[in-house]
Regions:
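Solvent-exposed soluble domains appended to multi-pass membrane proteins
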Residues: 1-178
Length: 178
């Protein structure tokens, strides 16, 4: 199934995450992942956790950015993988690792998790479309425009991940939401 017309859930990444995972609309000038005390939200991760799913969240950057680590651990995720989880030499800019590195890392974790025969949910947050753009030198983009190049790269990286995932035994029982 593919949707060709859709709207962004907000301007900032935190809006998209809370909208997609917890069904909260974007509230301008408000980050629903932050608070004096880490807020509890009911959504897909918490419901799946109650049903016995082992939930993982992958991000390219530092775990504390936007209070993501505390928020996601409080709200249904068991494991958080972030810049602190990756080798230091894999970091390419202030937002952490490249998309293809994160997808390959996530694939290894998903394969390990699948061997335990426990259902799981994995959320993979990529950040390559945030400046400063870093397109790997080996990637051959069809354009010279940096913003178009990074979109080409991001598209290639997710396609590469899906091609590799398709070869895994857990693929046939997996739903991908992009």
């Amino acid at each position: 199934m593919a949707f060709t017309n859709f709207y962004s859930a907000g301007i900032h990444t935190n809006h998209g995450m809370t909208a997609t995972l917890y069904s909260f609309p974007a509230l301008m000038f408000r980050n629903l992942m932050k608070g004096t005390v880490t807020p509890h939200r009911k959504g897909l991760p918490t419901v799946l956790k109650q049903l016995g799913y082992d939930n993982m969240f992958f991000m390219t950057h530092e775990a504390q950015y936007d209070n993501m680590k505390a928020f996601f651990l409080t709200n249904g995720y068991k494991e958080i993988f972030s810049q602190e989880s990756y080798p230091k030499d894999s970091v390419v800019n202030s937002f952490g690792v490249s998309d293809h590195f994160e997808f390959d890392f996530a694939l290894q974790q998903l394969n390990t998790k699948a061997k335990k025969h426990q259902p799981f949910m994995a959320t993979i947050l990529t950040i390559s479309n945030h400046p400063p753009y870093v397109v790997p030198e080996w990637f051959k983009a069809r354009t010279k425009d940096p913003e178009t190049q990074i979109v080409e790269y991001a598209d290639w990286a997710i396609g590469d991940f899906l091609r590799k995932a398709r070869k895994q035994p857990w693929y046939k029982n997996t739903i991908f939401v992009i």
